[in-house]
Regions:
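Residue-level signal for threonine
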Residues: 12, 94, 140
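Divalent metal-binding pocket/active-site signature
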Residues: 17-18, 109-117, 122-205
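Alpha-helical scaffold segments that flank or form the walls of functional sites
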Residues: 23-35, 95-96, 102-118
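A broadly tuned preference for mixed-charge, low-complexity surface segments
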Residues: 57-69, 93-101, 134
């Protein structure tokens, strides 16, 4: 989310971004940002590098993460496979939260293996190492899509999602996700604050979404 001097939603190559935390911090600084948060998907592995970069640049760093959660409300117009909860820790997160986050990150690996198995059964063999080399942290579908491009299965990342690994596509597989209330509880126990990422993405009317978020404990 952008204002003139604040950016609180940003990804690095520790999840589905293409650049290091240092590079992303430098880009933010060059754009006039003074307060910045790195919010990679389900991982905090980029925090230390991001914090060090911000200290050198004179920016304030707020540790953050984008937690993938179960869908809480069904939409008549869209079919997202998950909701994304942003969590921020101005005073840093606890070890308990980091351990919980690690369990979410680890759960991505079995799911990736199932998707690779599905592709293999359709005649497309991709070693998991060829996917993992694109990921410095959380292993996700964008990394699989890039591996599919490299293997010549598709011409672009968007084609990979549209034809093979997007929601409901032939090689798509679900993975266990926390519900929003559980994630909020873990964040609050560690002294953090929560917000729903890109609220218009889910296809829920705001006058329905906001009361639901309040009921679930989202800040």
């Amino acid at each position: 989310m952008w204002t003139e001097s604040v950016d609180l939603h940003c990804h690095s190559w520790h999840s589905d971004g293409l650049h290091s935390p240092t590079e992303m911090a430098e880009r933010a600084f060059q754009s006039g940002v003074k307060v910045w948060s790195l919010t990679d998907h389900d991982t905090d592995t980029g925090w230390q590098e991001a914090s060090d970069a911000c200290e050198k640049l004179g920016m304030r760093f707020i540790p953050g993460v984008e937690i993938t959660c179960e869908v809480e409300l069904q939409s008549e117009t869209k079919d997202p496979s998950s909701w994304h909860l942003l969590a921020y820790f101005p005073d840093g997160a606890s070890q308990e939260f980091s351990d919980w986050l690690l369990s979410l990150k680890d759960a991505r690996v079995p799911r990736m293996k199932l998707m690779l198995q599905a592709l293999s059964e359709m005649g497309y063999d991709i070693p998991i190492e060829d996917v993992a080399k694109f990921a410095e942290g959380s292993l996700g579908r964008p990394h699989l899509a890039r591996a599919m491009v490299e293997h010549g299965i598709v011409e672009s990342v968007s084609e990979a999602f549209e034809k093979w690994i997007g929601n409901g596509a032939p090689a798509f597989r679900e993975r266990p996700l926390p519900n929003v209330s559980e994630a909020v509880k873990m964040v609050h126990q560690s002294g953090g604050l929560t917000s729903l990422a890109h609220p218009y993405y889910y296809g829920i009317e705001i006058d329905v979404l906001v009361p639901t978020l309040l009921r679930l404990g989202v800040d």
